[in-house]
C-alpha cells in the first residue's frame, strides 16, 4: 500500500522512485581450495538461492512499475540484467502490436485481443520501448521494426508530439 501511495503521490513530478535492495547476498559460505563436495554443493545452493531471490525481487519491482533498484553486491548484477531483459522481452510482442495499432489509428481507442487502449496508454507504451532500449533489451532498430513509429518519433519520447506531427 505504501509503495502504491508513493507512486501516486510522486507521479508526474519527475521524481524517479527506486525500490529497496535485496539484502541476501550471493556469497558462498565456504572458502578455500580444499573444499569437500558437500561444501561445494552448499556454496552453489547458497548462491543460487540468493540469485533466485534477487531475480524475483527485481521482477516484482518491474511488474509494479519500479524501474530502479539497489544492488548491494556485484554478484547481483547478473540477476538484475536477467530480470530486466526478461521483463521487457516477454512483453515485447504485445507492446509492439498495441503501439503499432494505436499510432496507426491516430490515437483512437483500440482493442487488441482483450486489451483496450486509449490515449493515456500511448505514452506508457512509448515509455516501455524507451526503457527497453535504455537497458539494452532491444535496439532502436528492433523497436522501429516492430512499431510504425520513426526514429525521430521514438527519440522525441512524447506520444503527444507523435500524434500532433502525424495530423
Label the model's feature ranges.
Residues 1-167:
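Expand to "…catalyze enediolate/carbanion chemistry for C-C bond making/breaking, isomerization
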